[in-house]
Design a protein with these regions (language model features):
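Glycine- and acidic-residue-biased ligand/ion/polar-headgroup-sensing regions
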Residues: 1-2, 130-134, 138-161
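Active-site lining segments that contact anionic ligands and/or coordinate catalytic metals
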Residues: 105, 120-125, 133, 143-144, ...
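A short, N-terminal "cap"/entry segment at the start of jelly-roll beta-barrel domains
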Residues: 45-122, 126
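A short hydrophobic beta-strand segment most commonly corresponding to one strand
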Residues: 8, 22-43, 147
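Short, flexible loop/turn elements at secondary-structure junctions
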Residues: 11-13, 21, 31-34, 129-134, ...
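Conserved metal-binding segment of the jelly-roll/cupin
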Residues: 1-20, 27, 158, 164-175
Length: 175
């Protein structure tokens, strides 16, 4: 896991949270904790750390439009890729911006490489790049939106409130 990566922890798949480095880390969890706490459905099990096995999907899905197929069969995994590298998303954004300089919204969607659908079946994840000095008015949407700054800085105005955000800042726009 590296800075800016999107890590999926889908419902029903065992996973652990940890940090082996010495420097501080920001972990932004985007989930339904208020509902889970209200229903008293949250629990955890203290156990041994799992062994990290390299090559469990990260490298199999590194080329756009090309997915592994073993003897003409496709994977039926709901979540074949759990880590989406920020370096790949940033490269895609920069390529998109260079390819179409007039493009107002430089945005990519994190998708399931097997199905083409959203990376997570209950949440949509996007990366949006603003050019220096750009002002962008996003359309109103019914669902709430969470914005997290990975690089640079941005001034976000939501209704009558303005937020000056820098790297690692997060804000939410209610639906």
């Amino acid at each position: 896991m590296s800075r800016g990566d999107l890590i999926l922890t889908p419902t029903g798949l065992w996973h652990e949270h940890g940090h082996d480095g010495q420097d501080p880390v920001v972990w932004l969890d985007v989930l339904d904790l208020p509902l889970v706490y209200y229903m008293e459905a949250s629990y955890h099990i203290n156990g041994q750390r799992q062994d990290v096995v390299q090559g469990r999907g990260d490298r199999q899905y590194t080329r756009s439009g090309v997915v592994p197929s073993h003897v003409f069969e496709r994977s039926r995994k709901a979540y074949p890729l759990l880590r989406y590298a920020w370096t790949d998303a940033r490269a895609a954004l920069e390529s998109l911006a260079a390819d179409d300089p007039a493009l107002e919204h430089v945005q990519v969607t994190y998708t399931n490489p097997e199905t083409g659908g959203d990376a997570e079946n209950i949440l949509g994840f996007y990366a949006l790049m603003l050019r220096p000095g750009q002002t962008l008015r996003l359309p109103a949407r019914s669902p709430a939106q969470v914005f997290h700054v990975i690089d640079g800085h941005v001034e976000a105005t939501l209704v009558d409130s303005t937020f000056n955000m820098v790297e690692a800042d997060t804000c939410c726009a209610p639906g």
